[in-house]
């Protein structure tokens, strides 16, 4: 499987999200994510605007669904999303409902193991319930709280190989990764590389001489796309 680059549009304004998305697509980004802040601020309008502007591009709606699984997934599918996100900590029936909506509306389901006491078991459970992808996720508040207590901040890379080995579906690692770490994810067997807003501006190794963000993103995409993901041959 060829590595995929996804940009998380964690913005709160449609116009800004569309400008960033256009820049990202020109640079070679494969998937767009309507991030949770964009969905909270703009709702279905944000997803519809992305679909209207980028008709052939996969769009992930990061709903973080916890209940009302079928309706939420259905609404996002009708707005133009191709992928929706459900949380492993949701009730099993909610996950099943999202998966059913995905099948009914031709939308892929990404299961997020954020907050699971056993992250590997959470990933496996998501796969067993029918999720098409697993997001291995260390949350923002989790990382901040642990660091504030003077402990080592956890990283999704800590257990990424274990998660990848536990499931057959593609895995994405999210949460506090530096740009260089995100680019390394395919070498752990995780082919879906997500770039959050901070990652596109803070990595010196990928900044162009004139600070051109599009040029930097192009270098990042080339670095990811040039890799071969261990364990994936398709």
Where are these regions (language model features)?
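Catalytic cores of alpha/beta
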Residues: 20, 68-79, 117-129, 166, ...
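Catalytic beta/alpha-barrel core
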Residues: 10, 31-39, 58-66, 82-93, ...
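Active-site rim beta-loop-alpha module in soluble metabolic enzymes
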Residues: 115-166, 174
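Glycine-enriched alpha-helix->loop->beta-strand junction motifs that scaffold or abut catalytic
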Residues: 26-30, 53-57, 78-83, 103-108, ...
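Alpha-helix-loop-beta-strand connector modules within alpha/beta enzyme cores
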Residues: 40-64, 97-115, 151-173, 211-234
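Generic structural signal for helix capping and beta-alpha/helix-loop junctions
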Residues: 41, 69, 93, 119, ...
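Conserved N-terminal beta1-alpha1 strand-loop-helix module at the mouth
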Residues: 1-70, 126, 208-219, 233
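Glycine-rich phosphate-binding active-site loops on the catalytic face of alpha/beta enzymes
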Residues: 81-93, 134-146, 188-217
């Amino acid at each position: 499987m060829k590595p995929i680059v996804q940009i998380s549009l964690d913005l709160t304004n449609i116009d800004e999200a569309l400008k960033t998305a256009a820049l990202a697509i020109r640079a070679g980004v494969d998937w767009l994510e309507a991030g949770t802040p964009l969905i909270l601020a703009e709702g279905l309008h944000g997803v519809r605007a992305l679909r209207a502007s980028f008709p052939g591009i996969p769009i992930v709606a990061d709903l973080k669904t916890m209940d009302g699984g079928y309706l939420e997934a259905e609404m996002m599918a009708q707005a133009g999303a191709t992928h929706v996100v459900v949380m492993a900590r949701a009730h099993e029936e909610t996950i099943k409902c999202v998966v059913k909506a995905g099948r009914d509306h031709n939308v892929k389901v990404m299961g997020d193991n954020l907050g699971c006491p056993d992250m590997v078991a959470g990933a496996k459970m998501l796969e067993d319930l029918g999720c098409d992808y697993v997001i291995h996720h260390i949350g923002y508040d989790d990382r901040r709280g642990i660091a504030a207590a003077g402990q080592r901040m956890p990283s999704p890379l800590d257990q990424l190989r274990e998660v990848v080995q536990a499931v057959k579906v593609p895995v994405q690692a999210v949460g506090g990764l530096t740009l260089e770490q995100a680019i390394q994810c395919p070498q752990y067997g995780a082919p879906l590389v997500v770039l959050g807003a901070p990652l596109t501006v803070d990595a010196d190794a990928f900044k162009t001489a004139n600070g051109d963000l599009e040029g930097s993103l192009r270098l990042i995409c080339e670095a990811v796309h040039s890799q071969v993901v261990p364990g994936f041959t398709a």
